A protein has these predicted regions:
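Short linear motifs in intrinsically disordered/low-complexity regions
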Residues: 32, 46, 52, 57, ...
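A eukaryotic "domain-start" boundary segment
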Residues: 39-77, 83
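Intrinsic-disorder/low-complexity, polar/charged segments
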Residues: 51-59, 184, 222-223, 306
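Structured, contiguous alpha/beta core segments that scaffold functional sites
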Residues: 2-44, 77-237, 242-245
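Detector for Asparagine
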Residues: 31, 72, 135, 163, ...
Length: 335
């Protein structure tokens, strides 16, 4: 009976200790303020938020799932009066660069917009193919989108307009006239990522202090000399070795029985927010209980969530094909 009362009290205490953090995360995600206002309240800019979020391992795991799911979908190229040879060449070129396009799409989802630069190379028959796509996620802050849909590179030499027809790929996520840079998921993910990275630095001092066991010795000491002599042998025993004691003496170990439930609950709160934002649902492997039915539901919701990313990827793929056709019709082998 005492065990049941103790267990219930402990569970309530853990929930109480983490309720303030849970409420703060809930308030952050339910707030309808825009990206710029939220970043201002957090005290970081777009690039800082994006870099912090992308470097998190839980975010990286979710992005890997999304990246694999996007590449797993079938694709087909169609065009009126398009010959089989040109269609095969366009498809092989697109297929080779689909992973890079998917990376830029994920950057657009996290950072509000994604930018990639096409690097062209001529082939022996005169066809201008795209050799490489340079993802500009590491310097996204230097590329400024404007309300008219144009993109400007702001470097040390001033501003320079970017050719978004054939040279640059520019994909924005939910861009509006008042927010041409798009809605970035990294702004809302910054708080749970910071909790995962920095919150447990604070908790580590308690782990260091209370996770180690304590040895307690009870002896029959007739004088301080007897006590000091035993303590000297006891310290040597702790460092390694053996210890002999009298029949009336006793040595026991006290160890903290806490299993880290409070810390695990905080981590689960952060992971759930990250997964729900990116995947649309918390993974069943991170839930306390999971069933076959819930796993099937998770797969269905995951497929629906992938549709939003595929819409961005289809825009990127269409831009890729259009750029190839325009460049070759103007300077290379006409298609």
């Amino acid at each position: 009976m005492f065990g049941l009362i103790k267990s219930a009290t402990r569970k309530t205490a853990i929930k109480t200790l983490t309720s303030a953090t849970e409420d703060a995360l809930e308030s952050l995600f339910s707030n309808m303020e825009g990206t710029d206002a939220l970043l201002s309240r957090l005290g970081v800019d777009r690039q800082q938020a994006l870099d912090a979020v992308v470097s998190d391992d839980e975010v990286a795991a979710c992005l890997e799932d999304l990246h694999a799911a996007m590449l797993n979908k079938p694709w087909r190229i169609y065009g009126e009066d398009l010959g089989d040879e040109d269609k095969d060449r366009l498809w092989k070129t697109l297929k080779r660069h689909l992973p890079a396009l998917a990376e830029i799409v994920l950057t657009a989802r996290l950072g509000g917009y994604g930018v990639g630069r096409y690097v062209y190379q001529p082939e022996p028959d005169g066809f201008l193919t795209i050799k490489h796509i340079s993802n500009k996620s590491g310097e996204l802050a230097k590329y400024i989108p404007y309300r008219d849909g144009s993109l400007v590179y702001r470097g040390t030499g001033g501003e320079e307009a970017c050719n978004t027809d054939v040279l640059y790929l520019f994909i924005a996520h939910r861009a509006t006239s008042t927010n041409p840079a798009g809605e970035m998921a990294a702004a809302r993910l910054y708080a749970p990522v910071a909790l995962r990275k920095k919150g447990f630095i604070y908790a580590a001092q308690f782990i260091t202090r209370y996770a180690q066991p304590y040895l307690i010795a009870k002896i029959q000491a007739n004088s301080n000399d007897d006590h000091d002599s035993f303590m000297s042998r006891f310290y040597r025993f702790v460092s390694g070795g053996a210890l002999s004691i009298e029949r009336e003496d006793d040595v026991m170990m006290l160890q903290n029985s806490a299993d880290g439930q409070a810390f695990r609950r905080l981590e689960n709160l952060a992971n759930a927010r990250i997964q729900k934002t990116l995947l649309g649902k918390v993974k069943t492997s991170d839930l306390e209980t999971a069933s076959r039915a819930s796993q099937e539901t998770e797969e269905n919701n995951r497929d629906e969530r992938i549709g939003a990313y595929l819409a961005l990827l289809s825009r990127a793929a269409q831009h890729f094909i259009d750029a190839l056709v325009m460049v070759n019709n103007a300077y290379g082998k006409p298609i």
